[in-house]
Curated annotation (Swiss-Prot):
Catalyzes the first step of diphthamide biosynthesis, a post-translational modification of histidine which occurs in elongation factor 2. DPH1 and DPH2 transfer a 3-amino-3-carboxypropyl (ACP) group from S-adenosyl-L-methionine (SAM) to a histidine residue, the reaction is assisted by a reduction system comprising DPH3 and a NADH-dependent reductase, predominantly CBR1. NCBIfam families: diphth2_R. It comes from the Eukaryota. It is found in: Cytoplasm. One of its GO terms (molecular function) is metal ion binding. Pathway: Protein modification; peptidyl-diphthamide biosynthesis. This is 2-(3-amino-3-carboxypropyl)histidine synthase subunit 1. Belongs to the DPH1/DPH2 family. DPH1 subfamily. It comes from Cryptococcus neoformans var. neoformans serotype D (strain JEC21 / ATCC MYA-565) (Filobasidiella neoformans). It catalyses: L-histidyl-[translation elongation factor 2] + S-adenosyl-L-methionine = 2-[(3S)-amino-3-carboxypropyl]-L-histidyl-[translation elongation factor 2] + S-methyl-5'-thioadenosine + H(+). Residues 1-38, 498-529 are annotated as: Disordered.
Amino acid sequence: MPVPVDDSTAVLEPTEGIERPTKPAVKSRKRFVGSSKAATSRPVVRRVANQVPDDILHDKELNAAIAALPGNYNFEIHKTIYHIRRDNVQSVALQMPEGLMMYGCAIADIIERFTGALPMMLADVTYGACCIDDYTAKEMGAEMIVHYGHSCLIPVSQTTLKTLYVFVEIGIDTPHLSLSVRRNFPSSRSAFQRLILGAGEAAPGGKVPIALESTDESAQATPDLSTNDLPTRLALVSTIQFVAATQALRADLETAMPPLEKGEIEQEEEGMVAKVKRGDIGVWRGKYEVTVPQAKPLSPGEVLGCTAPKLNDVDALIYVGDGRFHLESIMIANPTVPAFRYDPYSKKFTREVYDHTEMRGLRGEAVKAARKNLDDQGSGSWAVLLGTLGRQGSLAVLKSIQNSLPADSLPPLLLLLSELSPAKLALLPNSQISTFIQTSCPRLSIDWGYAFSRPLLSPYEASVAVGRVKGWGGLSLDNGKEGGKLEGEGDYPMDFYADNSLGDWTPRHNPPRPRPARVRPQAQGCAQD
C-alpha cells in the first residue's frame, strides 16, 4: 500500500541542467536614494467593489432562511440583500419566468424580513430578458427591480431604475455529463463520423439513436487509444443557467484521461482477475477539440431562442438544457451541424433534428405573399406590431421597417400589442390590412406564423420582402417592376440581439466602423548643392 506524502516536508530535488547559485546574488544599487514615510505594516486589503460583506454572508438567520430554497439553485440572495441595504431601497420589484414563480413568495419573504423593503411580484408572463418590465415596476413605485433567470440583455444603463440580473445558475452532475459525452462520442474524429454520424437520419422533428447506445459488443468494449487520429471537434452551448457547467465540461474534454489502471488483484476460480472501475469501461479517454462559441453581447456558450452564433469547423454541437426552444435557434443558424441535447434533469442524451426544408418553405411562402400584397395597393396596407411586453418593442427597429417601405406604398398602420394570437389579429379587417410585421420575437413568425390567416413576418423577413436583403438559400422572389428573380443565399440568420447582425432591423445592430486609412509620411530627400 503506498505511503502518503506529506507535502509540507517534501524535499525538492535539483532540476537537471540548472545549477544552484553558490553565493547570494548581489543586489543592484539604487539609482535614487530617499526616505520613505510608509510604515512597515501589513498590506492594506481593499474590498472589491460590490463585494458582499462578511456580516451578510455569515448571517446565521439569513442562511437558515436561504436553506429553504433549492440548494442547487443560486438565487444570489446575499448579493440582493446587500444591494437593497446599500442603496436604502424601500420597495423592490421581483420578476421571474413561470418556472421559478414557485420560489417567488419565499424570496419575497426573505427580502422583506432582512431588509425591510416592500417586495412586489410581477406576475405577467416573462419569456426572456427582453421582457424585463422596468417601466411597470417604476410606475408601481419600485425603486429597484430584480430580474431572475436571464442574462443582461437590456443593459442596466438603459433601464429606468436600479436593475439587478440574477442568472439563477443551476448546479448539475458535471461528472456524469463529462462521462456521458466520453461514453457516447468518440474522441477520434474518424470514429465519431463512422459510429455516430453514420447512425442514420430520423423523421423530421424526431430523434435518431446514437450508435454507441446499442448492445453490440464492440460498442461496449473499452475504446482503443492507439490511433493517432485527429480529435473530434465539439461546440458546447446552453442557456445561461448552465453556462458554468459547459465551461467545466470544456476543461474536462480538452484534457485526455489517464490510461486505465488495474485495481486490486483478486483470486477467482478461473485465475487472477484485475478489477477496474465500472464507469471507466467503454469511455473514450482521448482529448477533444472543444469550442464554446459566442454571439456578443451574450456570454460565451449562451444561446437564446432568437440569437445564436454561427459555427465553423465543428463535427457536432452539444446543447446542455431541457427543452428544444433554445437549441432550435442554433440549429436553424447551422443547418449542417449535427445537434445533440443533454437534459441535466433526466440525464439523457438525444440526437435532435429540425425540418429546415419545411420551415424555409413556410417562411418563403409568407414572404412571397407579403411582397405580392405590397405591390398590389388594393389589397390593404402593412401593419407594424410594436411589442409592449417588457422591452420587446424597439423604436429603432420600428423606424427601420417604416423607412424600408417603398415611397409609393400605402403608409403602414402602427399597432401596440403585448402578446399576439391568431384570434386577436383576426379581429382586424382583411380589407384594410394585408400583412403583419411583428417586432416582438422572430420565433413568433418562425414557429407560429402558419397559424395566422395573413402573413406574419419578422423584421428580417420584412427586409427580404422589400428587397433590402436577398434572403436565405432556396428562396426565389420576383423582382417586381425590374423583372427577373431575386435568389436567396446562405442560411436563415438567428442574430436578432447580436451586435454583428446583418442589418438595422435588429435592436442592437452595430455595424463595424471603417478604419481610417493610414497615410504614410513622404520621405524627405536630401538637398543638393
